[in-house]
Amino acid sequence: MTVLHRRHEQGNEWVEKYIAFCVGTMAPSAMWQALLEAFRGFGGIAENVMQREGPFGMGLFPIDPGKTVKLRVPDALLVPIDAVQLQEGAVVIKDPSAFPPGYADWFMQYQANHSWGLDGCRSIEAFEEGLKALPDAVHQDLKRLGLYNLDNRFPGENREQEIFQRFLKTRFINHKGNKVLMPVIELVNHAPAAKGFNQGGDGIAVGGVHADEILVNYSVSDPLHRLLGYGFNCQEPSGFSLNLCLQHNGQQVVVQGGGRSDGLTKPCTIERQDDKLVVVQPLLGLRREPGLPRTLFSRACAVVPGLRANELFDQIHQGNTMALMGLLLQLEGVGGDGAAQLRQGCLDHWIAIGNDLGTRSDLLQSA
């Protein structure tokens, strides 16, 4: 375990107890319970939960699977990402006075022993090194497809800070107009079939009865954007387009790839810009309702005269398929974890966009 020493505020018995555990030689389970006791002392809720290794790496599990899990980080304990910094290798709050007395010390020890210092820094560094080691031709394809730009993402000018910034991007959540960190809850792993975070009322919460690992759906995404954004493979049920350029009916079409939070329910945006047509984040496949992607795309095309919706959808679909095939060919024979993860991401993405079958006539008629 990691112990960080700094001048900490006196008078908070929960923080004093937790720091005593960190300084001592207590078992990790005892330190975890001290962490939660201090967290509850600040107004947080953490019941029936423990941290341990699972199939997705370190995660949170119920102590008693037959009982309800309760986790809540109130607004007062959410930490804006611009309120933290990396100081001598430790994640610290810049201005402790903006939070309850003792919270900055608790947060620093929490990050050192359960988040950034436990697995966060190491896993981010390993993933970024794996991507950096890919062949130049793969880097060029990833950049063209809007998935990864080495020069912007990991230029190597300040390695520690670059890893830290990637860490923040994988941990923050948009809440009431701010990008914030949610201590303890951020340790919950992602699963597409799980419920999302409860952001109603005061703070952010996760709860319910969990037979095994506590999981939550981070957001709407697809396999490749999840992999390049978060650093792990996931068989997401939806597939969005990658960046593409093509010709349709004698006109240049620019497709902006990526997922949208409302991408499973609302048509994408299609508009004319100067001499080209811009299609923004079209959904190409959806496992639970394979007739929806083409239906939503047809509704988007209906507001732009002169488009042949089915033909353009097929062109975008084919362009994505060819791009994935190209990446897989470039990765053939390439070793390393980064190449292996990217290969799996391409295959998962190919499956995801393949969930396209027919249209929803009821939705087309009601448009």
Give the role of each language-model region.
Residues 72-76, 218-219:
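Short, surface-exposed secondary-structure boundary micro-motifs
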Residues 13-53, 111-221, 265:
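Catalytic core of the SET domain in histone-lysine N-methyltransferases
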Residues 7-65, 74-83, 224-225, 230-367:
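Charged low-complexity "KEKE/polyampholyte" interaction tracts
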Residues 79-104, 111, 121:
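Phosphate/adenylate-binding glycine loop and adjacent helical scaffold
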Residues 58, 68, 201-203:
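A generic structural signal for beta-strand entry/edge sites
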